[in-house]
Curated annotation (Swiss-Prot):
Name of protein: Eukaryotic translation initiation factor 2A
UniProt source species: Danio rerio
WD repeats by residue range: 21-62, 72-121, 270-311, 355-399
Coiled coil segments of this chain: 481-578
Entry GO CC: cytosolic small ribosomal subunit
Residues annotated as signal peptide: none
Family of the protein in this entry: Belongs to the WD repeat EIF2A family.
Biased composition (Basic and acidic residues): 494-505
GO MF assignments: mRNA binding; ribosome binding; translation initiation factor activity; tRNA binding
Keywords: Coiled coil, Initiation factor, Protein biosynthesis, Repeat, Translation regulation, WD repeat
Residue span of region Disordered: 435-530
SUPFAM superfamilies, per database record: DPP6 N-terminal domain-like
UniProt function note: Functions in the early steps of protein synthesis of a small number of specific mRNAs. Acts by directing the binding of methionyl-tRNAi to 40S ribosomal subunits. In contrast to the eIF-2 complex, it binds methionyl-tRNAi to 40S subunits in a codon-dependent manner, whereas the eIF-2 complex binds methionyl-tRNAi to 40S subunits in a GTP-dependent manner.
Amino acid sequence: MAPPTPHLAVRGSDGTLLLHGPPNCQESSAFQRDDRQGRYMTFSNDGTLFAWCNGSQVTVLKVPSGDLVKSFDLPKTTALEFSPLNKVLATWQQYTKTQDNPQGEANLQLWDLQTGACMKAFYQKKMTGWCPSWADDESISVRNVNNELHFFENNNFETIANKLHLQKVSEFALSPGSQPSKVAVYVPGSKGAPSFVRLYQYPNFGGPTCALANKSFFKADKVNMLWNKKATAVLVTASTEVDKTGASYYGEQTLHYVATNGESAVVQLPKNGPIYDVSWSPNSTEFCVVYGFMPAKATVFNNKCESVFDFGTGPRNAAFYSPQGHILVLAGFGNLRGQMEVWDVKKYKQVSKPQAEDTTHFSWCPDGEHIVTATCSPRLRASNGYKIWHYTGTVLYKHETPSGKELWEVLWQPFPAGVFPERAVKYQALPSELGSTEAKPAQAYRPPALRNKPQTASSKLHEEEPPQNMKPGAAGEKQPSKAALKNQKRREAKKAAKQENKPDEAPPPAADPAPVSHVTSSCGDPETDKKIKNLKKKLKAIDELKEQQAAGKVMQKNQLEKMQKEAQLLKELEDLELGL
């Protein structure tokens, strides 16, 4: 049976519609376009239901048939979400008070999608974190109420089944996946005490000793907590509003890894600067981080926080794994030019490098073959529209919003895991009438005084770093064999011996210093890099002693002992470099 075709929901000033995904890319005939301005829209987790509000009512339809499920007379609704099993629809509207009703009305409402009845209404003044978080099987749900977590079981919102009360719970994240459910909580520091993140397994909330893991840290005004798909670890990005050192306008960020087995670590990032994005691979064993002052670095780490692959530097601030995890897109949106780097994750080979200028939204289609990029208001009010691409860089469909109209949101219909299996990665761009938009290499600005002179390394504003595989002996990475290294060292030794035998010859005219024979490399391990650097320093000192000896200088005992250690040092250096 052929896999289904995902729909793309489009919301703007001219209404809400559903579009068939590629290859057709036509408006769905089963869904009648709503010409009224849509305030919000969402799909259910399995993609079988679609809901939107238009300032008059909230409507829920089946997808792809378009059959009506329920409609609710809720003209003020500005946000809505489905529970994971489609049993509950949560709606939220702005909290308001009147003279007749100084307490205001309960503005968070939970609706039974079977009967259409209101199950429970809560007061929720802030839109941030307005929706309850459900476990995937809806056995529990949780809300943050006055810095205290309230847990409900089996959608019974009349009774609080459990509470988690710490000093002041600011943020929480409920784990995905099967039972038992886990929750990550963040408590900001106060009165000199550090902030901390703790992981608990529901319902074991008996105190600090019941926590699965605990990570304390300073310098945190806010955090972002991201569970992996298997709920075995959380990545915590801790941020401060102001960088007291003055190094960054964005404040300071640190990345922490916290696992449910109690392990925790600070993820060491080789380049200073902000952390732009963190993304878990769907395999839950690797994650990608985009970080550092521009041009930013991007690195994939494993669950031991070790570097797996370094993508070098580039104009990027976001990372997006495909739903199957076989492709990674590194992109530079917002104030960057919209360059996208598409990588085959298994081979760590670049597939394409298209460019989508003025992009404010990017998302993967559930099939893992297509993506959508969009320019939306209010982030950017000019040139609104969206494009559907194949990941090889081909534009398959393009829509430009008419003048005077605005595009507000595009949203792919989700599907359960396993509906779209992983396909082999293609490197050849698909044919299309719209073609592809490969990024053209832009010429760097050069001052007039340097324009007629050859470009040197020192004339570059930023040092560029190429991609490098951090795994030893990784596929596609050519490393010199031991025999090749020995032959190279033997040739260098013969050349040095010839030079020693000609001490009386006039020295050749001064020239540019030759490059050091040992190529500077990085293994991602600061300790190993330090050892390599020290060994090279010692070998350089031995070379200088040999030159002095060849010139007739009498060597002292300690200098001769140093020279005798050359072979041993070369062997140590060879072992360390081969271990990269």
